[in-house]
């Protein structure tokens, strides 16, 4: 029998300690991983609701289980809010993740062995855009495009590759690209070779929802996203379209369920509904505007301190810092900053001489720090601290600089908590 006063702390102290330690880590570390964000207490409340218990195979109004009347309300709320948020005609809120959303799109539009054209992982793409280690590069014949030495997409190169390989589907989207993608140009290329245009907007969905980054819906046949990252909701996936083709919509529905998934995670769908409602609020646009302002402010500090920023700047929430000139590695920078309670991730940069697990750069993102209240002055100061640590790498004062920086980080984290008590 269950009682309301059952706790993890009493039942499983080892697990509870790990949860408490993670809570403390998030509060005492500055999070700059571009794909991470903080979900609101409302989102987490929905994830912990009794919908955790409910099986709901099928779609609203057409379920394979009884007792789904409230699950139907939740899922329809999420669908309707996502349609309003992004201007979509079709929405599927059931994908468990961005990768599963992408798998469902491939399954709906093309067949095994067909050719896809996507951005190279080493140039800022994603595993599911055709990387050979991913299902997308194993099931399908993947051809990859990249970026120029300046860190920009070369659309003529994309076009030439499309003309050569005649893909059935072109993937546009990224995991580490700091500029604005020309969705219209990508659609033009897709139309020229008779391919579908599939956009993965996972990294910039929040900016798009706020009207601060070009919306791909008017140009793409199908769009996917995660619901965390810039969007700031639960970890999950989403498929959208405004192509007007009912046959494509039907194929997408059946490709999610029953082809790729069984029962949806109704508690996560409830959390998605909360997230979409939050994103429709006026203050959400202000938040996303500050995300971009903070990224631009940090870029200027890195450049002033002598570090190269890929593409020379950013037009979204992230940027890449290259250490090729300094002879440093992303791995060493990642580790040193981590000791100072600043979390980033090592990342490959254009013409990177290092191996993928070493790299010559880091990726920096501002959604999390902005959500906890950092303003432009705060992030300029933060970028300066990061440069102090990077400047000291391999020198006698390295540990001293790291220790001094950590104290500054702890102080600002105390002033700007993630979840104020």
Curated annotation (Swiss-Prot):
Binding site for (6S)-5,6,7,8-tetrahydrofolate: 121, 125-127
Obligatory cofactor(s): pyridoxal 5'-phosphate
Superkingdom of origin: Bacteria
Pfam families the record matches: SHMT
InterPro entries with a match to the protein in the record: PyrdxlP-dep_Trfase, PyrdxlP-dep_Trfase_major, PyrdxlP-dep_Trfase_small, Ser_HO-MeTrfase, Ser_HO-MeTrfase-like, Ser_HO-MeTrfase_PLP_BS, SHMT-like_dom
Location(s), subcellular: Cytoplasm
NCBIfam families: PRK00011.1
Subunit record text: Homodimer.
Protein name per Swiss-Prot or TrEMBL: Serine hydroxymethyltransferase
Species in which this protein is naturally found: Haemophilus influenzae (strain 86-028NP)
Source lineage: Bacteria, Pseudomonadati, Pseudomonadota, Gammaproteobacteria, Pasteurellales
Gene field: glyA
